[in-house]
From Swiss-Prot:
Gene: Fbl
Keywords: Acetylation, Isopeptide bond, Methylation, Methyltransferase, Nucleus, Phosphoprotein, Ribonucleoprotein, RNA-binding, rRNA processing, S-adenosyl-L-methionine, Transferase, Ubl conjugation
Protein name per Swiss-Prot or TrEMBL: rRNA 2'-O-methyltransferase fibrillarin
Record field: transmembrane: none
Keyword Transmembrane helix: no
Span list, region Disordered: 1-93
UniProt cross-references to SMART domains, sorted A to Z: Fibrillarin
Cross-link position per record: Glycyl lysine isopeptide (Lys-Gly) (interchain with G-Cter in SUMO2): 90, 108, 115, 137, 149, 164
An annotated Gene Ontology molecular function: RNA binding
Biological source species: Rattus norvegicus (Rat)
Protein purpose: S-adenosyl-L-methionine-dependent methyltransferase that has the ability to methylate both RNAs and proteins. Involved in pre-rRNA processing by catalyzing the site-specific 2'-hydroxyl methylation of ribose moieties in pre-ribosomal RNA. Site specificity is provided by a guide RNA that base pairs with the substrate. Methylation occurs at a characteristic distance from the sequence involved in base pairing with the guide RNA. Probably catalyzes 2'-O-methylation of U6 snRNAs in box C/D RNP complexes. U6 snRNA 2'-O-methylation is required for mRNA splicing fidelity.
EC number: 2.1.1.-
Enzyme class at the top of the EC tree: transferase
Modified residues (N6-acetyllysine): 108, 127, 211-212
Length: 327
């Protein structure tokens, strides 16, 4: 193998032929090969350091192999660039989405974002973007539709999510709080999110999240028994449910009867496999909608979550709608 040509994918990081350990650069970044590469000249100096960085989103990429000092500084960095993403907000515009409290970040790649309620804090390693507006800097957090059913529904074009600034939301099946954190961003300091989760392990993460976000109230209880936590929760405007249980419509109905105001709304994420793995997804969705109608819950729209989730649908509707005035 010729000096200075490392194998694709970096094999050994390509130690760059002679150059004084030049480049072990590339390293974790996948494209390894480039790192080592140019080592050969001048004591390895310009080994084009941590290659990788670029891949995981414009992040801190380890500069150019530690400047010129000989030895090439092993091209630090690259590695975990991704976190801060297009931090500086150069060439990035943020515009409001038609759902109040949700925004679209337009840059090299468009992304769904929410305004960070706790600037400087990342909840689950998501990218953050700071935009200067006058003298203020506003920080936004990227919202990944592959990790959040609500984000998938919004990108899928759902007509209404009913979660908006100032709303009081009951979130069933909060898990570790990935989506809850974004709902907390949307409702803002004047809103509230009651996050119900049965698993104690996820509940720990949820409680830690609530320490920093004062509008989240964690409830570590089984959503099947709303009477156990009825003293903690006031009437709410919206119920969002992602419980993935065979009797999930019944669970949502029990909570709606207890906490949801008349004319309030619900957003339910349905995973067909969890309810009946033998029937087709469409049949499962249809039967769940029927059950909702029997519980005074009037579905208004249904949307599948392709391409983000398989055999998932979101149903949005209204609870006990007020009777229409007759003319």
């Amino acid at each position: 193998m010729k000096p200075g040509f490392s194998p694709r994918g970096g094999g050994f990081g390509g130690r760059g032929g002679f150059g004084d350990r030049g480049g072990r650069g590339g390293g974790r970044g996948g494209r390894g090969g480039f790192g080592g590469g140019r080592g050969g000249f001048g004591g390895g100096g310009r080994g084009r350091g941590g290659g990788g960085g670029g891949f995981r989103g414009r992040g801190g990429g380890g500069g150019r192999g530690g400047g010129f000092q000989s030895g090439g500084g092993r091209g630090r960095g690259g590695g975990r660039g991704g976190k801060r993403g297009n931090q500086s907000g150069k060439n990035v515009m943020v515009e409001p989405h038609r759902h109040e409290g949700v925004f679209i970040c337009r840059g090299k790649e468009d992304a769904l974002v929410t305004k960070n309620l706790v600037p400087g804090e990342s909840v689950y390693g998501e990218k953050r973007v700071s935009i200067s507006e006058g003298d203020d800097k506003i920080e936004y957090r990227a919202w990944n539709p592959f990790r959040s059913k609500l984000a998938a529904a919004i990108l899928g074009g759902v007509d209404q999510i009913h979660i908006k600034p100032g709303a009081k939301v009951l979130y069933l099946g909060a898990a570790s709080g990935t989506t809850v954190s974004h709902v907390s961003d949307i409702v803002g300091p004047d809103g509230l999110v009651y996050a119900v989760e049965f698993s104690h392990r996820s509940g720990r993460d949820l409680i830690n999240l609530a320490k920093k976000r004062t509008n989240i109230i964690p409830v570590i209880e089984d959503a099947r028994h709303p009477h156990k936590y009825r003293m903690l929760i006031a009437m709410v405007d919206v119920i969002f449910a992602d419980v993935a249980q065979p009797d999930q419509t019944r669970i949502v109905a029990l909570n709606a009867h207890t906490f949801l105001r008349n004319g309030g709304h619900f957003v339910i994420s349905i995973k067909a496999n969890c309810i009946d793995s033998t029937a087709s997804a469409e049949a499962v969705f249809a039967s769940e909608v029927k059950k909702m109608q029997q519980e005074n819950m009037k579905p208004q729209e249904q949307l599948t979550l392709e391409p983000y989730e398989r055999d998932h649908a979101v149903v949005v509707g209204v609870y006990r709608p007020p009777p229409k005035a007759k003319n």
